[in-house]
Structures are given as structure tokens and as C-alpha cells.
Amino acid sequence: MQCFSFIKTIMILFNLLIFLCGAALLAVGIWVSIDGASFLKIFGPLSSSAMQFVNVGYFLIAAGAVVFALGFLGCYGAQTESKCALMTFFFILLLIFIAEVAAAVVALVYTTMAEHFLTLLVVPAIKKDYGSQKDFTQVWNTTMTELKCCGFTNYTDFEDSPYVRENNAFPPFCCNNVTNTVNETCTKEKADNQKVEGCFQQLLYDIRTNAVTVGGVAAGIGGLELAAMIVSMYLYCNLQ
């Protein structure tokens, strides 16, 4: 009985933390969606390069909602000793775990397919908004500065973009691989000669370089999810 009470308390405290994290993610996601400019101004230089490729606001809202609901279910199920809530918590966490494993396998096996899919989404956005949408342009400038890359695939992503039409030149990042002369006009010939790597390939390189760290974090998250599933099932099986 004492063991049951101890595990129940741990379950409540753990899920309370998850609940608060979900609420924080939701709050930040809503803030980014409503006032993205101020978010980028404060956190842009410090933000993860990987997050630059997605709409951060919607991503955080979706992730926050799932984490928030999961934390609430875990707390409620453990506190009220509700078998229904605990079983729902278990199955949602199991689905998330399976989805994460599947996503990891797909990412490892179908990297080329993922690149093609993302290219179809990202490149048209660059051609449409780079140079005309301030926040979008700032995000890409930060990404290209941090990763020392050019565009999603290469400099051709910027052809016909508002920036190229207005300046009759490509972003300086596309000509900054060798000479480091940012102030020089980046013509198509210079960009073609210097062949600065696209940001997707550069990001993959950085991830592979830090594979141990990435793998450790992923394993840690997976371990916590497995532990939470085991605890929830233990509580479920020991309830009257």
C-alpha cells in the first residue's frame, strides 16, 4: 500500500510538471503567432536552427496542447484513481511513442524523400516571401548566418524572389563561403562559383555531427515515456 501511495504521488508530481510545461508551450506558441516580431527580436539569435524551418508558433501550440492534455489526464487519473483516465493516458502516450519511433525510422531511411517533400513546401515560400515579409526574411537571415548556408537547397531558391527582383542580386550569404566579403554584390555567377551549401544539407550535417547528443536526448525522452506508461499501468492494475 505504501508503495502504491508513493508511486501515485510521483505520478501526480511528474504529470503536474508536464501540465505546466504544456501550459508554457501553449502560452509561448500563442505569443509567437500573435506577435512573432517581438519573439524573434528577443530570442531569434538564440533559437535552434532546426526550429527556423517550421512555423514556430503553430508548432508550439500543437505540441503544447498535446502535452497540456497529457499532463492533465495523468494528474487527474492518479489523483482520482480513475481507471478510464489512466488507460486513456497510457494509450495516448503509447501512440506518441510509436509515432516518434516511426518518425525516427522514416527520417533515417527516407531522408531523400523528406528533402523532396520539404523542398516542395519551403522553396515556393522563399520565392514568394523572402525580401517582402520582414519576419520571414529575418528568420532565414538568422538561419543562414548560424549555419553558414544559402537557401534551402542552394542559391537558386532565391530566383524570382522579391529580394532578387528588388536588388538584382542574391543574398550575400550565397557568396560568403570563400572570400567572406559580405559587402560585395552577390551575382548569379559568383553564387554559382562558390556553391555555398543549402541549409537542409548543412542542418543534416550538424545533426550527424552531434548524433550522440541528439541520440541521448531522444533516448532520454523515450525512457521517460516508457516509465510513465509502466507507472500508469501499475496504478491501473492495482486499483480496486
Swiss-Prot record:
Extracellular face of the membrane: 31-52, 110-210
Compartment(s) of residence: Lysosome membrane
Membrane association type: Multi-pass membrane protein
PROSITE patterns found in the cross-reference section: TM4_1
Example GO BP: protein stabilization
Keywords per UniProt: Glycoprotein, Lysosome, Membrane, Transmembrane, Transmembrane helix
Pfam families (UniProt xref): Tetraspanin
Residues the record marks as carrying a glycan: N154
TM segment ranges: 10-30, 53-73, 89-109, 211-231
InterPro entries, alphabetized: Tetraspanin/Peripherin, Tetraspanin_animals, Tetraspanin_CS, Tetraspanin_EC2_sf
Stretches assigned to the Cytoplasmic side: 1-9, 74-88, 232-240
Family: Belongs to the tetraspanin (TM4SF) family.
Subunit details: Interacts with SLC19A2. Interacts with NTRK1/TRKA.
Known role: Structural component of specialized membrane microdomains known as tetraspanin-enriched microdomains (TERMs), which act as platforms for receptor clustering and signaling. Participates thereby in diverse biological functions such as cell signal transduction, adhesion, migration and protein trafficking. Regulates neuronal differentiation in response to NGF by facilitating NGF-mediated activation of NTRK1/TRKA receptor tyrosine kinase and subsequent downstream signaling pathways. Plays a role in the inhibition of TNFalpha-induced apoptosis.
Protein known as: Tetraspanin-1
Native species: Macaca fascicularis (Crab-eating macaque)
